[in-house]
């Protein structure tokens, strides 16, 4: 078991420890449970799906990197597939606070990067901030998305974000988590860049059209990709680097182990992620970063 989970694991009931232990003891446990695993844990622990999501919040919060606030937030995104995806806040020193990944963003992007096509519910240990409410409003099924908080009745997102501004106000009908491929190509590039290109092709950028993706390779040889997730309100948009760093953190790898990175974006786009990605990666100790342009 990854050391970050040890204290939180001890908070669980004995039956839940017995059911969950073999799963999180796996060296490759990546802070998610498949639908079959969720069902098996529910049966063994005598919990329903929503109760299990609440019970897992301490484990999700244990993934937080809250070096500035020291405030750990955990979230569980329940996919339409039945899978559970952990999320946790992630803060970065030496750059702007705007680079922070919020726990709800973390769980949603985690699900998206694992090719989930929609969410039933997001369970979180603290009330979602306005930033996160707006971020979740970009989802295809935002109208039916349930928000679940300890000590409160479940409520749909619109309860927390009434009279919302969203994609429909900008005549946008392609939404976050839709299955999309922009079809861009690059010639004569390495495997890492091809993964960054694939991420760019699956990014959500209907407002700026500035599709972008990134791929990070660690010292262990693992590769983590990130896609740009744009938002109708602009500021809650999640850059591709943050999406990749979040996936890496949830998988239990230290961002300081990144050795190589590749950024792919559209040439002459109105939005570029290159400069801030380069700065943040340098702060993490990675200076071997390739930059590739998709031609118009």
Swiss-Prot record:
GO terms for biological process: cytidine deamination. Pfam families: dCMP_cyt_deam_1, dCMP_cyt_deam_2. Zn(2+) binds at residues 102, 129, 132. Binds 1 zinc ion. Keywords: Hydrolase, Metal-binding, Zinc. The active site is at 104 (proton donor). Its EC number is 3.5.4.5. Substrate binds at residues 89-91. Homodimer. Belongs to the cytidine and deoxycytidylate deaminase family. PANTHER family: CYTIDINE DEAMINASE. This is Cytidine deaminase. It comes from Pectobacterium atrosepticum (strain SCRI 1043 / ATCC BAA-672). The lineage of its organism: Bacteria, Pseudomonadati, Pseudomonadota, Gammaproteobacteria, Enterobacterales. The gene is cdd.
């Amino acid at each position: 078991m990854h050391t970050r989970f040890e204290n939180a694991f001890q908070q669980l009931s004995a039956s839940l420890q017995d059911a969950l232990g073999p799963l999180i003891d796996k060296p490759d446990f990546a802070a998610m449970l498949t639908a079959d695993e969720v069902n098996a844990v529910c049966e063994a622990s005598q919990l329903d799906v929503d109760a299990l999501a609440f019970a897992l919040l301490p484990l999700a919060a244990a993934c937080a990197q809250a070096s500035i606030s020291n405030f750990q937030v955990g979230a569980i995104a329940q996919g339409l597939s039945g899978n559970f995806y952990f999320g946790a806040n992630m803060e970065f020193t030496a750059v702007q606070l705007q680079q922070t990944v919020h726990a709800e963003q973390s769980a949603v992007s985690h699900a998206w990067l694992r090719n989930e096509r929609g969410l039933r519910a997001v369970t979180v240990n603290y009330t979602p901030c306005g930033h996160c409410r707006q971020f979740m409003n970009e989802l295809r099924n935002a109208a039916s998305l349930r928000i679940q908080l300890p000590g409160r009745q479940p409520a749909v997102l619109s309860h927390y974000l009434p009279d919302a501004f969203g994609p429909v106000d900008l005549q946008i009908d392609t939404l976050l988590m839709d299955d999309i491929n922009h079809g861009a190509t690059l010639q004569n590039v390495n495997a890492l860049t091809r993964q960054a290109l694939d991420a760019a092709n699956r990014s959500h950028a209907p407002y700026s059209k500035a599709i972008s993706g990134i791929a990070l390779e660690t010292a262990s040889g693992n590769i983590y990709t990130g896609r740009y997730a744009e938002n109708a309100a602009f500021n809650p948009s999640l850059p591709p680097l943050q999406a990749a760093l979040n996936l890496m953190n949830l998988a239990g790898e230290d961002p300081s182990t990144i050795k190589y990175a590749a950024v792919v974006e559209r040439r002459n786009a109105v939005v570029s992620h290159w400069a801030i990605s380069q700065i943040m990666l340098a702060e993490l100790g990675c200076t071997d970063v390739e930059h590739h342009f998709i031609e118009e």
